């Protein structure tokens, strides 16, 4: 490439960049309108999650926990009857998979909402900012908890598949029957625990967010009224 071509390309790139910058519209707050629109949209979504979704999820997951009881006898009967899958476990697992994916989506919205409200770094009262950072960390921890449960689902199917393969090869070995039944029972107990864990995530986060909503939206708006977030 000649120096003339390089100069021409550089000039073209500069022109494109200038055109792109020129196309950005600035709002009254001094910020690009696209970013202001994004912040407004996220705030609206976060409000819906806080006021509507989170209370409903607490009730929904509590009911799911109460309605998902089983026993070791049920799990063993599933294996003895020749079923390749434990329908009770797989149905609850699929329901919780949807619940976890929704939790992750909602917590991502709330975390972005909190982060978009964090002000510029200044000296003075940063108490509200520390609350924002604390709750953003709690939202991330809740998301990671959900992702952790998803990993256990994959491991369950892999482990059970190996046991089923051995059972088909040695159908008269009673230990394989009992091993699969024990695996199913343990998984069912963990899934019920998952119901409570998801429920508790929603409940605790809802409580913390509603108690500190003013500080989350305007962290420096209460400079003369500093108190504990708890």
Where do the model's predicted regions map?
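N-terminal leader/presequence regions that precede the main folded/catalytic core
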Residues: 1-87
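Eukaryotic low-complexity, intrinsically disordered regulatory segments enriched in serine, proline
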Residues: 2-4, 20, 29, 37, ...
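Generic structural signal of hydrophobic/aromatic residues within well-ordered alpha-helices
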Residues: 38, 49, 135, 146, ...
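Charged, low-complexity, helix-prone segments enriched in Lys/Glu/Asp/Gln
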Residues: 42-61, 103, 146, 153-156, ...
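Extended, amphipathic alpha-helical segments that serve as helical scaffolds
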Residues: 68, 90-163, 167
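Long all-alpha helical scaffold domains
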Residues: 75-77, 81-84, 91, 95-115, ...
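Short, charged/polar, low-complexity loop and linker segments
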Residues: 78-89, 119-132, 174-190
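Alpha-helical oligomerization segments
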Residues: 165-230
